[in-house]
Amino acid sequence: MKIYFPKKLLVLFLIVCPVVFVRAQADGKSIIEKAELNTRGKSSYMETNMEIIRPKWTRSVQFKSWSSESNYGLVFITGPAKEKGQSFLKRNMEVWSWSPAIRRTIKIPPSMMLQGWMGSDYTNDDLLKASSVVDDYTHKLLGEETVDGKRCYKIELKPKDGAAIVWGMLLKWVSKDQLVAVKTEYYDELGELVKTEIASNIKTISGRNMPSKLELIPADKSGSKTVITYSNMKFDIPLGTEIFTQQYMQRVK
């Protein structure tokens, strides 16, 4: 038995469907943009403790970080003593490291951006934000779900053609009331879950909502995770581009 649709209904369906798809993309991107601006600001300064947890050992790394927009970033290691003084610089899409032990500045190639940073589950790309979840991905609003008691937007991010991104897909859950990405899942190109990041202890600082604790849990390493705790967070502070230079990264304190 054939089923016939009225011609007007079919035309309306063909018009509305693309509009709904574009609206879902636009809404997804605007939510991600607001969440990024909310947690990063135009500029920022933070002091951080990073705890690397493994089944048989735990160690901590302390560092300071400065950022300006999404183009500039500087990280300075303050502890432990044997690693103190190392610094990492991001300018646009280029990243360098400085080691006082060998007194050398080394440019980090794209192939090393996914290596574990300071032995943690975070990568160089994660810490220095070399890739942008706003500019390097497409965004699709999948719907709403509840995470840890918070009603969230669920958004699918896929890398744009030509973007230097290793992930096949990200899923982000952004809280509706505070616009904070409370959960992020990272998938490889085969669609397998690689790691999950959980954000908690959300605080209001300078009028913006910011998680003061992040947990990154690898999917294939039982008993392993990296916990980041932020303190002394400042946003929208005056930062000149002169601090984001190879010369300054060698003398930052």
Q: PLM features: residue spans?
A:
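N-terminal, post-signal-peptide region of Sec/Tat-exported proteins
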Residues: 47-82
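Bacterial N-terminal signal peptides that target proteins for export
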Residues: 1-11
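Short, exposed beta-strand/loop patches in secreted or surface proteins that constitute
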Residues: 63-67, 87-88, 142, 200-202
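Short hydrophobic/aromatic-rich beta-strand segments that constitute the beta-sheet cores
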Residues: 46, 73-77, 95-99, 105-107, ...
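Flexible, processing/modification-adjacent segments and terminal tails
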Residues: 25-43, 49, 58-59, 87, ...
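Gly/Pro-enriched, hydrophobic low-complexity segments
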Residues: 128, 148-246
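Bacterial N-terminal signal peptides
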Residues: 11-20
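Short, mixed charged/polar active-site loops
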Residues: 57-62, 83-87, 105, 169, ...
